From Swiss-Prot:
GO cellular component: cytosol; endoplasmic reticulum; mitochondrion
InterPro entries xref list: ARM-like, ARM-type_fold, Armadillo, RAP1GDS1
Xref: SUPFAM superfamilies: ARM repeat (SSF48371)
Subunit note: Interacts with ralB. Probably interacts with the post-translationally isoprenylated (geranyl-geranylation) forms of ral proteins. Interacts with both GDP-bound and GTP-bound forms of ralA, but interaction is much stronger with ralA-GDP.
SMART domains in the cross-refs: ARM
Annotated gene: rap1gds1-a
Native organism: Xenopus laevis (African clawed frog)
Tissue: Weakly expressed in adult tissues with highest levels found in spleen, kidney, skin and A6 cells.
Family matches, as Gene3D superfamilies: Leucine-rich Repeat Variant
PROSITE patterns on file: ARM_REPEAT
Protein name per Swiss-Prot or TrEMBL: Rap1 GTPase-GDP dissociation stimulator 1-A
Coiled coil, from the record: none
Length: 607
């Protein structure tokens, strides 16, 4: 430490009137002290006031510049010294040094600026004001094809500097993207794939930039997919593959890049990783299995990439994914079910899969998770079944396969995501399937659960789906038994509330179901309809100018049917329905206008 004090005194006395020979010893002493105890030495250097002297030496473009920049780089390793470096005015002369032709000067300057910018807003702002990032980007562009070790080392430092400059700062990352840094980094990855340090730095840079939506288009315009898959194939170490995964996940959110990754052979790589890790109990392998299978599912979210991998149901990838369903590994079961849910995003695929007996594989999987099962697997398998049930030709086949019975086993689930998918699957299955709707609709436990879930205000999705299934059971069965079951379970009030939904489709479904109730079982339901203030709701819907034509039409149909009940008829008479309905006779929609005339006649006759 005495040597450090002596060196600092000597530097203060000499000032900027230095020659390299005279001060080399002092600078070496500072570097040695910083290497031995960075925290203590850097604080001592700052307290001595020598940082301002460094700014003057750097400004003078002295031959000492590279040594001074080196010292600044070491000082800035101490996070407490970064702001003092900015306050001492070191950034402007350091940025000017970026114009140097001397590689050692550029190397130490890049290190100094990178260290000052690390987690330091003031440092970044100062570099931004001096235009430092653009100079570094230009250097990288011009040096990209140089493969000598010193150039590769400098490019690694420059990449690191840009990352420290822009890390977790959207506006600075956007600035780098606008400067065209992405194609440069992709080229660097391609040319220098043998250089571990430089490729890792490029990957870290990609990881930072790929999170930004504005970066995706630029990435899609490069051969990033090809380069990164090529690199992935070479990697055997967990840590290296993990870095690549961190880049792939945000990139794969873009549909164009999804397709590029599929064409570059990423899926085959991921399947290999799954194969290698599936039976391992090591934490690293378990994590890698999850990441690989999750990424596979993400690639299937793109319509084009999904169809390419489906290959008419004959693709090897599709077949491999199917083999995951009977696996004993929950992660693979989950990924397999999610993959099928994604493949089942168009009718053609769904029809092929149902004809290929995939439904039974999903039912077998669900059956393994009925008692204390894995919620994510339940949710994924139900998602797949729901999607498969959408095409009309699949419904009867799936009902025959026992899908409804299997799904109903999960009625006791207390997990909203499972409840939501269960409801959606049943609703899809009974669409235009009168017999199934009647059979399922008479299930008292289901009706009770639906009524309970119709009140799940904390889970809007579950609440909405419960209401829609209640309505669907009535609309598709047109069964008195189903209506009585729903009346006994207390479901009527929820259908009336559903008629006031902000979604027109739900309003209409509720009104059609209520119309059937009034037509088929009015006496059984009249008390509940009166308690739920049905007539008031219908009056409001007809008065509301925002109500869609089909809402007005079905409200009037329901009014006519409801008048068959004495208490409901009295309610109708209390409100000025005639006035409202007569105005609707001139409605621009002919069907509404005709129904208004019929309703007016009925109101007049029965008033």
């Amino acid at each position: 430490m005495d040597n450090l004090n002596d060196a600092l005194e000597k530097l203060k006395l000499t000032g900027t009137e230095c020659t390299s020979d005279k001060l080399d010893g002092c600078f070496d002493c500072l570097l040695q002290a910083l290497g031995h105890n960075n925290t203590e030495s850097s604080e001592k250097i700052q307290q001595s006031g020598i940082l301002q002297l460094f700014a003057s030496i750097l400004n003078s473009q002295s031959s000492c510049a590279s040594k001074v920049a080196h010292i600044v780089a070491e000082i800035a390793k101490n996070e407490l010294m970064r702001i003092p470096c900015v306050e001492a005015g070191l950034i402007p002369p350091l940025v000017q040094l970026l114009h140097s032709k001397d590689q050692e000067v550029l190397l130490q300057t890049g290190r100094a600026l990178g260290n000052i910018c690390y987690d330091n807003h003031e440092g970044r702002r100062a570099v931004d004001q001096e235009g430092g990032a653009q100079i570094v980007v230009d250097h990288l562009r011009s040096m990209c094809t140089l493969t000598d070790p010193s150039s590769e080392k400098l490019m690694t430092v420059f990449c690191g500097m840009l990352m420290n400059y822009s890390s977790e700062n959207d506006s600075l990352q956007t600035q780098l993207i606008q400067m065209g840094v992405i194609p440069i980094l992709v080229d660097l990855l391609g040319v220098h794939s043998q250089n571990t340090a430089l490729t890792e730095m490029c990957l870290v840079a990609f990881g930072n930039l790929a999170e930004l939506e504005s970066s995706k288009e630029q990435f899609a315009g490069t051969n990033i997919a090809e380069e990164i898959v090529k690199l992935f194939k070479k990697q055997t170490e967990h840590e290296k593959r993990e870095i690549i995964f961190e880049v792939l996940a945000p990139l794969a959110e873009n549909d164009a890049i999804k397709m590029q990754l599929v064409e570059a052979g990423l899926v085959e790589c991921l399947l290999d990783v799954v194969q290698q890790t599936v039976n391992s109990e090591k934490d690293d392998d378990i994590a890698e299995l999850k990441t690989s299978s999750d990424l596979m599912v993400l690639l299937l979210l793109g319509d084009e990439s999904m169809q390419k991998l489906f290959e008419g149901g004959k693709g090897s990838v599709f077949q491999r994914v199917l083999s995951w369903l009977p696996s004993n590994n929950h992660q693979l079961q989950l990924a397999g079910a999610l993959a099928i849910a994604n493949f089942a995003r168009n009718d053609g695929n769904c029809i092929h899969m149902v004809d290929s007996e995939i439904v039974q594989k999903l039912l077998d999987l669900l059956d393994r998770h009925v008692e204390d099962g894995n919620v994510t697997v339940q949710h994924a398998a139900l998602s797949a079944l729901r999607n498969l049930a959408i095409p009309v030709v699949n419904k009867a086949k799936m009902l025959s396969a026992g899908v409804a019975e299997e799904v109903l086993k999960f009625l006791r689930s207390e997990m909203p995501p499972v409840q939501f998918k269960l409801l959606g699957t049943l609703r899809m299955l009974i669409d235009a399937q009168a017999e199934a709707a009647e059979q399922i609709g008479k299930n008292e436990k289901l009706a009770e659960r639906l009524v309970e879930w119709c009140e799940a205000k904390d889970h809007a999705g579950v609440m909405g789906e419960s209401n829609r299934l209640l309505s669907a059971l009535i609309r598709h069965s047109k069964s008195k038994d189903v209506i009585r079951t729903i009346v006994q379970s207390g479901g009527i009030k929820h259908l009336v509330t559903m008629a006031t939904s902000e979604h027109v489709i739900m309003q209409n479904e509720a009104l059609v179901a209520l119309g059937l109730i009034a037509a088929l079982e009015l006496q059984a339901a009249e008390h509940d309809l009166e308690s739920a203030k049905l007539v008031e709701v219908l009056h409001r819907l007809l008065l509301d100018e925002r109500s869609a034509p089909e809402i007005k039409y079905n409200s009037m149909v329901l009014i006519c049917a409801a008048m068959g009940s004495v208490p409901l008829h009295k309610e109708v008479q209390k409100l000025a329905f005639l006035d409202v309905v007569s105005k609707l006779r001139s409605h621009e929609n002919k069907t509404v206008a005709q129904q208004a005339s019929l309703t007016e006649q009925k109101l007049t006759v029965q008033s």
